[in-house]
Amino acid sequence: MSYQVEFATKWSDFDPNRHMRHTAYNDYAAEVRIRYFTHAGFPVDEISKDNIGPILFTEHTSFRKEIHSGENIIVNAKLSALNEDKSRWKMRHEIFNESGKVAAIIDVYGAWIDLEKRKLAVLPKKYDTLLDGLDKTEDFELIKSKRN
């Protein structure tokens, strides 16, 4: 089973058309990523003590079904790609509406940044298992290094 979190949607998630605003989907996906890090034993505030933090290069959202005001949603996280040194990663989030249908799929491409140097970084070895607890997507791939 993939890592997932159930949320009660809130009034501010919705737009004048009475469905969830597009940015709210991405906010919930981001929340799941951060909660996953804590679940894996590495809260972001602990990682930041080593001057490292997660960043995104891209975030692509595909909307499938509406989510209406008052619905509870489930948001999961799966690993869809990873490079050899685990410095770059891709995650896929599926957001399910209250009737269990996929309402959106969000694909993100991320990495780690050195918070002082403002350059891409590799996580210290003590975080090697951070992403190991995520299920892999069926189309999981290895990200080829651009350094070679």
Set out the residue ranges of the language-model regions.
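C-terminal edge beta-strand
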Residues: A8, D107-V108
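Conserved GNAT-family N-acetyltransferase fold
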Residues: A29, H93, I106
